[in-house]
Amino acid sequence: TEGLNFRRAFREAGFHISGVCVWVKNSLVLGRSSYQWQHEPVLYGWLPNGKHKWFSDRKQSTVWKFDKPRRSKEHPTMKPVPLLAYPIKNSSAPNGVVMDLFGGSGSTLMACEQTDRVCRTMELDPRYASVIVMRYKAEYPDAPVHVLRDGQELSYEAVST
């Protein structure tokens, strides 16, 4: 597994690892390993000299049980919105900014909308960037949507055709 590489990268980026949470899925993720994974580790931490605030009670568990989405044609590793909403609510205040530099299918953006947070996300792959915009627009059809692409701000209509 890549667990040690992720921990090393987390530390090399200057973050303090406070712990590891575990997303327990309702089904296996088939692979080439003898034991098939039914969980994903989630590193939890913050910058050592940064402010660390907690917005929940002291009864939150490191074991997160959320159903894995069925296979998605939009994105191969789509995360369930409730999975992301859970730590977002615990780790940020309403109207706080949440950054996701790997936008994927837009689950973080959707979780932020549902929890009254502001999401700043990016996705390098144009296909997945389009998935994010279309997923958002399907859920919030009246919301104004603008996309920043190559330094230019574009309307939803310009990128959806």
Where is each model-derived feature located?
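Core catalytic lobe of class I
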Residues: T1-A129
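S-adenosyl-L-methionine
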Residues: V133-T161
